[in-house]
A protein has these predicted regions:
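Beta-alpha junction/loop-to-helix N-cap segments that form part of ligand/metal-binding clefts
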Residues: 4, 31-34, 77-84, 97-170, ...
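Extracellular/periplasmic Venus flytrap/periplasmic-binding protein
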Residues: 114, 118-119, 123, 166-281, ...
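Periplasmic-binding protein-like
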Residues: 128-140, 160-162, 203-206, 259-268, ...
């Protein structure tokens, strides 16, 4: 029986706080300004964590995690799978004896919000830094991470995201990692999928967000390399819409006027307003493509068959049935709800396990020690492959080099702290507006 874990308690407290904050807060700085400021910092080429290092005597305290996950906002649907993945990982780690003989826990869970109000993530980052946790899981939005990564990693705290894909984040900080591949991998796969289906003229409906524009650029590059053309929403055209927009009549009208063969929607929760507008203007939804930001279960949002045969991509191969069962059981037991989406659950699980294994190999739970062993346990230096914390821990404790190969299927970290390889899952919508896994393409980062 799975007990109500410390992770579940932390998430419950964070959820209550997020609801209160959402009720009291107002819209403030948009993603353009916040992301722009963060990108300007990254362009300097300076490592925010350059002064951080492992202590001469590694910490022997119990390992504690912080989380920065979307409990509110346009990415809130990605919160449950990440929570389930992280919580299940905590339980599995502790069932195998914990780290350096002590149980691990999530002690500080916070709400990342989304890019429409960066004050939410800025406040959360301050809370996480004050809590002195060595590792923070999150954020899921690339724009949110760009808003807080300097703040978090300059304080010598590891930030590891299960879902960030913006290329701007590759090699951003020596204390920043991700278990999702950069957009160069997904963008190439999505572009090839669209053109491979016989579509020559492509329109983008894309929001002005680091994630949206970055992915659009890589998809466009793949489309044009395959002989296709972009007729609306392309790079440099100034046709992006702001995050949080709720009406799309003019954008859809303009996109359809360009007579595209296919439309690629790159957005988050805005998709729930874009799709009805496309339908009302007579668009064939089977010619619609989406990405990990919006390839989700819309069975409760649209009439049956609305998205039938539309397609989308999500980094990561489809989790095995047994792993999904564990996730749904954990979530139902600890959160009291059904788990409907699995996007980035495996990546969240792997992020927790990798950091725990790094602490075990380094025989210490401080951020510096963990950071020094992250590449090693991921297999960057070669090693015996192992797929569970329990099996890997036995090897590590015996002094054996390992390569952790978890449910997400990502390869070892490269020099930029990105996965060196990853799978991109291809999904097609059924008559209930649910994405159904079709196949996976493996790609390498560059």
């Amino acid at each position: 029986m799975i007990r109500t874990s410390s992770a579940a308690k932390a998430f419950a407290i964070a959820g209550a706080a997020a609801i209160l904050l959402a009720a009291c807060s107002t819209e403030s700085a948009g993603s353009g300004g916040a992301s722009g400021a963060a990108s300007a910092s990254s362009s300097s080429g300076k490592d925010p964590a350059a002064s951080c290092k492992a202590p001469s005597k590694p910490s022997q305290d119990a390992l504690e995690y912080g989380t920065l996950l979307p409990l509110t906002g346009s990415l809130a649907y990605l919160g449950p799978p990440a929570i389930a993945g992280a919580g299940l990982a905590i339980d599995d780690i502790n069932a195998a004896g914990g780290v350096i003989g002590k149980d691990v826990k999530i002690s500080t869970a916070t709400d990342s919000g989304d890019s429409t109000d960066m004050t939410v993530s800025s406040s959360a980052a301050q809370k996480l830094i004050a809590a002195k946790v060595p590792v923070v899981l999150g954020a899921e939005s690339s724009s949110v991470t760009l808003n807080v990564v300097d703040q978090i990693t300059s304080n010598c705290t590891i930030e590891i995201s299960p879902a960030n894909t913006a290329t701007d984040l590759s090699g951003y900080s020596s204390y920043y990692y991700r278990t999702a591949p950069p957009d160069t991998v997904q963008g190439s796969a999505l572009g090839q999928l669209v053109v491979g289906d016989g579509n020559a003229k492509i329109a983008f409906l894309v929001f002005n967000d680091a994630y949206g524009t970055g992915l659009r650029n890589t998809v466009q590059k793949a489309v044009e390399a395959a002989g296709g053309s972009v007729v609306y929403g392309g790079k440099g055209k100034g046709q992006e819409f702001p995050p949080g927009q709720t009406t799309f009549s003019s954008e859809v009208t303009a996109a359809l006027a360009a007579k595209p063969d296919a439309i690629v929607i790159l957005s988050f929760d805005e998709t729930k307003s874009i799709v009805p507008e496309l339908v009302s203007q007579g668009w064939d939804m089977s010619k619609t493509y989406m990405s990990d930001g919006n390839t989700a279960d819309y069975s409760k949002d649209f009439d049956p068959k609305t998205l039938l045969n539309g397609q989308g991509t999500i980094p990561g191969s489809d989790p095995k049935a047994a792993f999904k069962t564990k996730l749904t059981t954990w979530y139902k037991t600890n959160e009291g709800k059904d788990l409907h989406d699995f996007a980035y659950a495996a990546e969240s699980y792997d992020a927790m396990v990798l950091t725990a294994l790094a602490a075990e190999e380094g025989k210490g739970t401080d951020a510096g020690t963990i950071q020094a062993h992250m590449a090693s346990v991921s297999g960057a230096e070669g090693g015996t492959k192992c797929s569970t914390f329990a099996d890997c821990k036995k090897l590590v404790d015996a002094g054996t080099k390992i390569q952790y190969t978890g449910p997400s299927g990502v390869g070892p970290f490269n020099a930029d702290n990105d996965p060196s390889s990853a799978y991109i899952g291809i999904y097609k919508y059924d008559q209930d507006n649910k994405p159904v896994y079709q196949s996976a393409i493996q790609g390498s980062t560059k």
